[in-house]
């Protein structure tokens, strides 16, 4: 072929556009939502030379193959668990169903793959110092097994402190298992993991890649944050392991986040969620520990694990059910506000029902494109009657939902398409008036440090900013 021919580049561009048409048709048939299909198809048709390779990396080509593989691994894991006679929650599940509070969860117990359980104890952990002080203190007392899972682990001061603590516990004979997301922790040096392995800690990266093509598939990420110590004490929430979560990032400080400390039968569900991810990464089961007895009182809890391999879109349906169930209020905090059409419609309908709908988002960006898309959605929400607030002191990263007077949810799930359909997430649902009062008090303080977005703000935005927001929203389904 004559590469210097005047026709060569014409043929090449024609071939690229033809491939773009094929890829656009593929997106229309395989992407799960209309918004996502359009967000891929239009750029593939008009600028394929810029979007073909990103579509191969982030698109839907291997989605269904991955779903099949993940479900098969989960099935194998549960067969292995059945041999352990792992049925720890029968009595607590029956007690939960007999409780008057159970009705407040409505569809949640059937939506999640794990039951609502009674007799749990929960403690709110506000911001990084309280969270990591509690986690480190729990690990310090470990005698048998420590399970640690984070989306991001940094090799900084906090990361090194965790590393040294885990090495010390492993040297004492404690079995330590660490799981991190390969994409989220892309900056973690191999030496960090190797030092842990050399010290007896079992550490693995969670990756969705299987086979030659799937090595390019980086769009599914494990966003869960789980710590379980000896089957007795657990932690989930929004924090990852890094100095910025302690407020050490100058541009984002002070960092605002929330975790929750848990004890009781629901820890079996946290262990099962960890076991699924560990089994996918290693094809082995970690040790699972159950206490001999549980307290006879406590609060109703349900661990809601969600991910792209679920039979239905668990995370987005959770937000829909939470909003639809609200009769008095629904308050949501999320670092990103990119609702799909169904969730946005649910928010508007809640306003029309007279529900106090509030959403708290950051005033500072950590991802500028996502921030721009969130801003446009926020302006549209304000016009629909939703009260939108921007947290002023620093970056807001917490993921909290408060419904009426009893139901609260704290976990890793953001109010965006990535959490709805691409990430593995975990959230703790709690039905308890006393704990909900604590969450309400915490959120009241956050709102006091926030500025409400007004209709005037939506009008004062420069036209170039509006254009940028609309472009960001166009690609928001694939962010």
Curated annotation (Swiss-Prot):
Domain of life (superkingdom): Bacteria
Stretches that traverse the bilayer: 8-28, 38-58
Organism of derivation: Pseudomonas putida (strain ATCC 700007 / DSM 6899 / JCM 31910 / BCRC 17059 / LMG 24140 / F1)
CDD domains: PLDc_PaCLS_like_1, PLDc_PaCLS_like_2
Cellular compartment(s): Cell inner membrane
Location of the PLD phosphodiesterase domain: 218-245, 392-419
The name this protein goes by in its record: Cardiolipin synthase A
Membrane topology category: Multi-pass membrane protein
Pfam families tied to this protein: PLDc_2, PLDc_N
Catalysis performed (reactions): 2 a 1,2-diacyl-sn-glycero-3-phospho-(1'-sn-glycerol) = a cardiolipin + glycerol
Keywords assigned: Cell inner membrane, Cell membrane, Lipid biosynthesis, Lipid metabolism, Membrane, Phospholipid biosynthesis, Phospholipid metabolism, Repeat, Transferase, Transmembrane, Transmembrane helix
Family indicated by similarity: Belongs to the phospholipase D family. Cardiolipin synthase subfamily. ClsA sub-subfamily.
S-S pairs: none
Gene: clsA
Enzyme Commission designation: 2.7.8.-
NCBIfam families the UniProt entry points to: bac_cardiolipin (TIGR04265)
Main location: membrane
GO cellular component, one term: plasma membrane
GO biological process, alphabetically ordered: cardiolipin biosynthetic process
Described purpose of this protein according to its UniProt entry: Catalyzes the reversible phosphatidyl group transfer from one phosphatidylglycerol molecule to another to form cardiolipin (CL) (diphosphatidylglycerol) and glycerol.
